[in-house]
């Protein structure tokens, strides 16, 4: 239990560090940081579940004169659980703020584009008629406006298109991260179900009088299934990591 507790402490420290960085650099933080926080949250939840299961087993197997030790483990579990809930809530709030800032910037860019187009249209409509006296000045002004338009508008349009591309890329990465997180949660839930089924099956087999050798064979088969499960989980995490590394 101490090893699991130390592992949970490291995960909590990493989570708080990433959340602090995300909060400090809310606008400029890379999308990969959100993926790292989501992955750490899922791993932290898994560690808490394992710690809770070991604590239950400790309560069953320990004697009654270890109340102080039980209280220590219970306090650790409550503290870690509360830290996990707080971190999860803070991450949700930061993602909401991040989305609001992006939406506001996008709206501002659209309004700026509309204002610029309106100004250019008014200039064209309100332009004075050309006279022989002002041909030279008009040609000079027209040339100057053409140069300014050629220098300014393409740059603005390029920045706006680049911003639009980044927004679409961020939205796509958000969907990928959400799918990965949901897949991890589904896998975690399936693992918990398998653990409960294994415990119930073992008890039922003992009640039915099945030999220990048969139960051991069943447990070996379950171990192989768990191994396949953890390999799949590792491949999924690696896939998410490479996606974030490639697009981040």
UniProtKB/Swiss-Prot annotation:
Subcellular location: Golgi apparatus membrane; Endoplasmic reticulum membrane
Disulfide bonding pattern of the chain: none
Record InterPro entries: GOSR2/Membrin/Bos1
GO cellular component labels: endoplasmic reticulum membrane; ER to Golgi transport vesicle membrane; Golgi membrane; late endosome membrane; SNARE complex
UniProt keyword Transmembrane helix, yes or no: yes
Species annotation: Kluyveromyces lactis (strain ATCC 8585 / CBS 2359 / DSM 70799 / NBRC 1267 / NRRL Y-1140 / WM37) (Yeast)
Pfam families hit by this protein: V-SNARE_C
Vesicular side: 248
Keyword Protein transport among record annotations: yes
Ranges facing Cytoplasmic side: 1-226
A GO MF label: SNARE binding
Principal localisation: Golgi
Stated name of the protein: Protein transport protein BOS1
Family from the record: Belongs to the BOS1 family.
BP term (GO), one: vesicle fusion
Superkingdom classification of source: Eukaryota
């Amino acid at each position: 239990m101490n090893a699991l507790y130390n592992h949970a402490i490291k995960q909590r420290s990493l989570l708080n560090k990433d959340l602090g960085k995300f909060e400090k650099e809310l606008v400029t933080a890379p999308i990969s940081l959100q993926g790292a926080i989501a992955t750490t949250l899922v791993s932290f939840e898994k560690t808490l579940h394992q710690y809770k299961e070991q604590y239950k087993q400790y309560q069953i197997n320990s004697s009654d004169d270890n109340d102080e030790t039980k209280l220590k483990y219970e306090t650790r579990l409550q503290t870690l659980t509360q830290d996990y809930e707080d971190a999860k809530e803070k991450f949700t709030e930061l993602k909401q703020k991040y989305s609001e800032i992006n939406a506001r910037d996008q709206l501002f860019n659209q309004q700026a584009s509309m204002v610029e187009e309106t100004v250019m249209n008014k200039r064209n409509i309100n332009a004075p008629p050309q006279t022989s006296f002002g041909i030279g000045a008009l040609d000079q002004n027209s040339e100057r406006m053409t140069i300014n338009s050629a220098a300014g508008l393409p740059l603005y349009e390029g920045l706006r298109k680049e911003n639009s591309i980044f927004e679409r890329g961020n939205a796509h990465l958000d969907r990928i991260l959400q799918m990965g997180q949901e897949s991890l949660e589904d896998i975690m839930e399936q693992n918990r179900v398998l653990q409960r089924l294994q415990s119930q099956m073992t008890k039922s087999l003992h009640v039915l009088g099945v030999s220990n050798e048969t139960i051991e064979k069943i447990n070996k088969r379950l171990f192989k299934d768990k191994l396949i499960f953890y390999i799949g989980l590792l491949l999924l995490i690696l896939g998410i990591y490479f996606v974030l590394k490639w697009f981040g």
